[in-house]
């Protein structure tokens, strides 16, 4: 049984919402680097899309551990934190980006990128899920 499939259904509901969360990766000295991000629940994993040159890519290449937190804006006391590891893959078709922006009401994500932008998918596989 996966961590996500055994998670509280309320946590899964938050992760399915069109919210902004905070992805935290680790600098080389172990200090946190946090970024507000859109995301997509994809089966048991959480997907993010990013572009070349971002600090989070350098951090993940060195240490794939990460945490992701999102709260329900209609109830500030309702949140979920997902801890796990991230695998980075090339996303030249920007499929992940488009799926994420569609969740937020945009037809596609082409307006978010300049021509020639190099896109990557970050796949967070949970090892622990907590929340309220």
What are these language model-derived features?
Residues 29-31, 72-76, 114-116:
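A short beta-turn/loop motif at secondary-structure boundaries
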Residues 19-20, 65, 105, 129:
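Generic structural signal for secondary-structure transition and capping sites
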Residues 2-6, 78-132:
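Charged, gly/pro-rich active-site loop segments
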Residues 12-13, 43, 104, 132:
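Charge-dense, helix-prone N-terminal extensions
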Residues 18-51, 66-70, 80-81:
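Short beta-strand segments
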Residues 1-20:
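Extreme N-terminal tail/first-helix region
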Residues 54-56, 75:
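Short, surface-exposed beta-strand-loop junctions and turns on beta-sheet-rich folds
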């Amino acid at each position: 049984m996966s961590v996500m499939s055994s998670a509280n259904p309320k946590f899964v509901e938050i992760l399915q919402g069109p919210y902004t969360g905070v992805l935290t990766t680790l600098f080389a000295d172990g200090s946190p680097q946090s970024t507000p991000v859109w995301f997509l629940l994809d089966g048991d994993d959480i997907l993010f899309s990013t572009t070349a040159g971002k600090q989070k890519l350098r951090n993940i290449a060195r240490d794939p551990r990460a945490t992701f937190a999102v709260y329900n804006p209609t109830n500030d006391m309702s949140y979920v934190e997902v801890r796990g590891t991230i695998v980075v893959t090339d996303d030249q078709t920007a499929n992940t980006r488009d799926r994420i922006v569609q969740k937020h009401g945009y037809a596609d994500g082409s307006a978010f990128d300049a021509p020639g932008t190099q896109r990557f998918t970050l796949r967070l596989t949970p090892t622990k899920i907590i929340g309220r």
